[in-house]
Amino acid sequence: MVAAIVVASVIILTQCFSNHENDSGTSIMVEVSATENEFDKIMDRCCEVMEKRIQLFCEDEPGLVKAKFSIKRTNDNKRIRIDFKNVELGHDQVARVLNLLQSQGCLQFYETYTFNELSDCFYKANVKLAEKDNPNLEADFKFLYEGPLFDLLKHSFNQIAPGKYEAERTACVGKAKAIDTLAINQMLIETRDLFPHDLKLAWTVEPEIVDDSEVLGLIALKLSPDNKCALNGEAISDARLEYSSYNGEPEILIMMNNEGAKSWQRITGNNIGRQIAIVFDGYVYFYPVVTSEIPNGRATISGGNLTTEEAINIVNILKAGMLPVPVTVVE
């Protein structure tokens, strides 16, 4: 079996191998492409992170606790070879290993906007797109239901009086079918100048099923004054799998270092009654309402139909740290 993965600046090749009559296993080859002045640093960091991730994977995987593997640079010094010796990984195990290797492991916490705060921006964007499609458009069309953007991105409104509606005060600014997200992304790029400069939009990680269609939420993230997230994975000291006392579903408990805990206390204290979004590798996993200041440097990732296997993978990725380059899979 041979599979190929293109990794932004990394190519991963996996194959089952058999070098000797009684010697078989699974081999993973990683090729790194970087500028000369940072090449060694990237290679060393990739080796370090991958070794930690695979070690944690073996510890959690039945039958692999004592599995032997090696990680080393090839002779040309441009690739990293990972060998599982005398162990042929099953299809599901290979998929898990590739997921561990291709995930950059980028954890971020964001303050958020609400749809109530942005509804005028979305209305103007919808009108601009509608006028582009039809320059002679009448101005009295029903903006809540019509127009290129609103035909695909459905918003939530509360009725506050007969015939009068108010945009919901939620960080989820709309929901759309998964198949429509690329078209919506393009529309929002075309109308970017109508939105706040510190707004960043991100989709939820797992779809909900509505009328047999996969539907994702679009979450309004608010950038810090330096155009970054409010807090990132560098604040994390540990992570572990737990199960909710409320519904028994898996969740990830995150513990922060001293500096991270202080920042988390400030962030939660400044956002009581608002939502904080927890983003992993670009997708929103959870955006809970802050009910009180959190002084103990702890946070929980849950929801999004998170499975135990996915939770274990994320815990292992967080424990091992980020890869220096993002990873994407190509058939």
Region spans (language model):
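Membrane-proximal juxtamembrane linkers immediately C-terminal to transmembrane helices
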Residues: 19-28
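Hydrophobic membrane-insertion alpha-helices, especially the h-region
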Residues: 2-12
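Non-transmembrane, solvent-exposed regions of membrane trafficking/translocation machinery
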Residues: 29-289, 295, 299
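Extended, hydrophilic extramembrane loops/domains of integral membrane proteins
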Residues: 298-331
